Amino acid sequence: MGKVYLVGAGPGAPDLLTLRAARILAAADIVLHDALVHPDTLKLAAHARFIDVGKRYGKVSTEQRFIHRALIEAARTHDVVVRLKGGDPMIFGRAQEELDALREAGIETEVVPGVTAALAAASTLQVSLTRRGIARTVTFLTPRVGRGETVSGTDHNSMPDVLCPPWLPAALSADTVVLYMAAGAGREIAQALIDGGKPSSTPVALVESATLPEEQRRITTLGELARATLARAEGPVVVCVGEVFRDALDELQLDSNPDAAPNELHRQVHR
């Protein structure tokens, strides 16, 4: 019987992988990886077999129960099994479900942490999520609820993926909020926060594909975001809200094109 390692691949850039993660990948016999793991990260597992078990919002995704079965089967036939997850396995990675399934099957497990998207976004923006006198609390959350998931007593079995109101109180009570899996939902998130009592002047930063060459950043306010027309995001997006981004809002010009329509957020590409 082999051992399964739940390994965090970090936010995207391969050189943000931890040394332990790189060592385990090099020894891997089989790697079950997320869709967003960088190809150069996979190259570290030079002798491994690969299985793509990725999940992407709005696209065909691997069912969780299949992932559980595949991990158990892999552990029965291989010594070193790696479940490679984007970011950190323990942040919105369904790691607990996989750990529980593996433990129930009597399989040894280990978790190797990775850099989560919220911290990658803060680093690329060069804005601390906490700041003396401004932000003492930080909340990570996702507004999305998957099919069949129950949140606060509400069964969403009939809805494939929704913006679920129970996230709002947590977002309103924190000084800084980072919303994961927010692609395509920026306007709705901004309007919900405003309706909940957040000032429309509150700074908000959107970071897509943090740490990668195609990374894109947008700095604006909740009010502007609620009215904006956003281009379709190709990569993962986090939405960061709070007064800690005030200086970034003052320093960065949202739109470099003076002839652009005022209600349109234009992409800023940083390489």
List each model region and its residues.
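Class I S-adenosyl-L-methionine
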Residues: M1-V115, A226, R232, V237
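A contiguous loop/helix-start segment that scaffolds small-molecule binding in enzyme catalytic cores
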Residues: G2-V4, R76-V81, V145-R271
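Short hydrophobic alpha-helical segments that form membrane-spanning helices or hydrophobic packing faces
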Residues: L19, A120-A122, I189-A190
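Acidic/glycine-enriched edge-of-secondary-structure segments
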Residues: R49-E63, R131-R144, V177-V178
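Short hydrophobic/aromatic-enriched beta-strand-loop microsegments
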Residues: R49-K55, E108-E110, L129-R136, G197-L206
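Class I SAM-dependent methyltransferase SAM-binding "motif I" and its flanking Rossmann-like core
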Residues: D88-A174, Q216-I219
